[in-house]
Amino acid sequence: MESKALLLVALGMWFQSLTATRGGVAAADRGGDFIDIESKFALRTPEDTAEDTCHLIPGVTESVANCHFNHSSKTFVVIHGWTVTGMYESWVPKLVAALYKREPDSNVIVVDWLSRAQQHYPVSAGYTKLVGKDVAKFINWMAEEFHYPLDNVHLLGYSLGAHAAGIAGSLTNKKVNRITGLDPAGPNFEYAEAPSRLSPDDADFVDVLHTFTRGSPGRSIGIQKPVGHVDIYPNGGTFQPGCNIGEAIRVIAERGLGDVDQLVKCSHERSIHLFIDSLLNEENPSKAYRCNSKEAFEKGLCLSCRKNRCNNLGYEINKVRAKRSSKMYLKTRSQMPYKVFHYQVKIHFSGTESDTQTNQAFEISLYGTVAESENIPFTLPEVSANKTYSFLIYTEVDIGELLMLKLKWKSDSYFSWSDWWSSPGFAIEKIRVKAGETQKKVIFCSREKVSHLQKGKASVVFVKCHDKSLNKKSG
């Protein structure tokens, strides 16, 4: 009996030590202010971006030296989002590696709140306040204990982690330099007050990428409203290229159901990969443009860089703090590198056609000094005589300075007796093109005085006008 009693006492002491320690350090040794911190702070290394091999423990000063924290460099704090598996997702080491490649001497800390993030979504959403408090306590401790400047701190939060980052920023003794929200979660936060979610007040500068806002407000995976100083909506912020239903069916057919969860979060997670792209391809940042609506952007009406109307996506963003949040838009490719080249095209259709034709399909081909991009499809909602139409197109390659273009009006997909009897057509004298990335405006003229574009017929060629006054650079 005595041996059993001793065993029970020993087990009790062992269990008590487990509940009072974290990272191998007794809670009492950490100080009373830090006992309630459940989140873990792993300083990952360039050599091992996938494992949490060394933890910075609030209240334990030697842990900072043991992990070789660099006090003279930037610090990135990465905060993950909700998880089904209770494990880190594959993007975490990719982001860590990209941060170290861009800033080799920096500190990249990964916040582990997996046990709280694995609960039912509403429960995990509620835990973001506690996680934010944990992160704020850690940052305040680093600032007070080691005089580490918060100007060197950049928080990066994905999904629920974006709101945890915002709450952390609101609770630090001084503002951190920057918070990047990577598609902040929508449910439970779309209508939340600023103190409970990411907001512009949470850091000196807050930039946000919105990549999966499809659905009604409050039900979309990503938050729809702007919550930063600069809010960027790639491809309108709804679905991302390569993440559509057709792609899902193809992947399921090829690989089975194992990758379904990846497809569901494809657009949501694209925010992370866009930011990674900005770290790895610093020479060619993607450019976004301020616009009142995505509909106006699709018409090509917003490709201006005057008065901070355009900005870089991702790490090299210009830290413009407007009085109110600015919504910015851009197109991207379906895979890295994501950068594309935007063009506004304006065409005036002249003629005697009395009918208005709807949903008309066209193709345009651009030819430049470096490359060419042919048969770019676009659709005009309506086409009428003696009206000017503006629309947006983009190329996946840099074609250089524009020299020539071709325009084709495609036949309807259905048979039309009127088109068979007499193809409708318009006279076009000039086509105006503005390049978003270079801000150059070019006017293209018909080789003859006027070109006649007919539905279902051959392409019409336009060349750069000779009058130099017509071709200029505009802000």
Swiss-Prot record:
It is a peripheral membrane protein. Tyrosine nitration after lipopolysaccharide (LPS) challenge down-regulates the lipase activity. Its main location: membrane. Changing residue 241 to L: In chylomicronemia syndrome; no lipase activity. GO terms for cellular component: chylomicron; extracellular space; plasma membrane; very-low-density lipoprotein particle. Glycans are attached at residues 70, 386. One of its GO terms (biological process) is chylomicron remodeling. It is found in: Cell membrane; Secreted; Secreted, Extracellular space, Extracellular matrix. Residues 430-434 are annotated as: Important for heparin binding. It catalyses: a triacylglycerol + H2O = a diacylglycerol + a fatty acid + H(+). The modification 3'-nitrotyrosine is found at residues 121, 191, 343. Keywords: Calcium, Cell membrane, Chylomicron, Disease variant, Disulfide bond, Extracellular matrix, Glycoprotein, Heparin-binding, Hydrolase, Hyperlipidemia, Lipid degradation, Lipid metabolism, Membrane, Metal-binding, Nitration, Secreted, Signal, VLDL. The active site is at 159 (nucleophile), 183 (charge relay system), 268 (charge relay system). It comes from the Eukaryota. Belongs to the AB hydrolase superfamily. Lipase family. Homodimer. Interacts with GPIHBP1 with 1:1 stoichiometry. Interacts with APOC2; the interaction activates LPL activity in the presence of lipids. Interaction with heparan sulfate proteoglycans is required to protect LPL against loss of activity. Associates with lipoprotein particles in blood plasma. Interacts with LMF1 and SEL1L; interaction with SEL1L is required to prevent aggregation of newly synthesized LPL in the endoplasmic reticulum (ER), and for normal export of LPL from the ER to the extracellular space. It is linked to Defects in LPL are a cause of chylomicronemia syndrome, also known as type I hyperlipoproteinemia. PANTHER family: LIPASE (PTHR11610), LIPOPROTEIN LIPASE (PTHR11610:SF3). This is Lipoprotein lipase. It comes from Neovison vison (American mink). The gene is LPL.
